[in-house]
Amino acid sequence: MGGRMWLPFPVLLLSALPAALLRGAAGFTPSLDSDFTFTLPAGRKECFYQPMPLKASLEIEYQVLDGGELDIDFHLTSPEGRTLVFEQRKSDGVHTIETEDGDYMFCFDNTFSTISEKVIFFELILDNMGEEVQGQEDWKKYITNTDVLEMKLEDILESINSIKSRLSKSGHIQTLLRAFEARDRNIQESNFDRVNFWSVVNLMVMVVVSAIQVYTLKSLFEDKRKSRT
């Protein structure tokens, strides 16, 4: 075929656009996702800070993957120091808030535990971070024709935003499923160790009881009378 490589139509159309216009594509989706897993020792409290703009969306989801009774205290505080969320002895939680301008603080508190450390997973989803409007304006500056193969650039932008939004949602779901899988695996391993421990204990008890029963029965049939000479 002469070494030609055919691209899907949206990619082919984007490849013909100016380079500066393609740089504006970085502003398609103003959504930022990040997840972390850390170990919180017994008797300790760990806090994190997240700067947020005005009227954005902050979603926090957390799970206790391993340790003790899989429980933790969770606190979410506004930039003014006002308590937004206060949960005690929870294994998981999801919270979404509309933000003010400033630094939000969220803490995981394990001070109630004196023995068990906790493995904690949490994910942050930041929406409406103020980049979408600027990204769309960058596109519109380079629109010179009202029609490109009967498809408007706004339609392409909407399609790309929809695809990226769905991909982001799929990645979010996969991250949560991995966290659930890790927690379930830890629970199964803990149950496995407990079953093995108590099985060994029961086996030892059965052996000791059997030995006592054999000794008792044997002593009942022994002739303890001394023979006279």
Swiss-Prot record:
Its main location: endoplasmic reticulum. One of its GO terms (cellular component) is endoplasmic reticulum-Golgi intermediate compartment. InterPro entries: Emp24-like (IPR015720), GOLD_dom (IPR009038), GOLD_dom_sf (IPR036598). It is found in: Endoplasmic reticulum membrane; Golgi apparatus, cis-Golgi network membrane; Endoplasmic reticulum-Golgi intermediate compartment membrane. Residues 45-126 form the GOLD domain. It holds the Pfam family EMP24_GP25L. Residues 1-27 form the signal peptide. Keywords: Endoplasmic reticulum, Golgi apparatus, Membrane, Protein transport, Signal, Transmembrane, Transmembrane helix, Transport. The keyword Protease does not apply. Potential role in vesicular protein trafficking, mainly in the early secretory pathway. Required for the maintenance of the Golgi apparatus; involved in protein exchange between Golgi stacks during assembly. Probably not required for COPI-vesicle-mediated retrograde transport. Belongs to the EMP24/GP25L family. This is Transmembrane emp24 domain-containing protein 5. It comes from Mus musculus. The lineage of its organism: Eukaryota, Metazoa, Chordata, Craniata, Vertebrata.
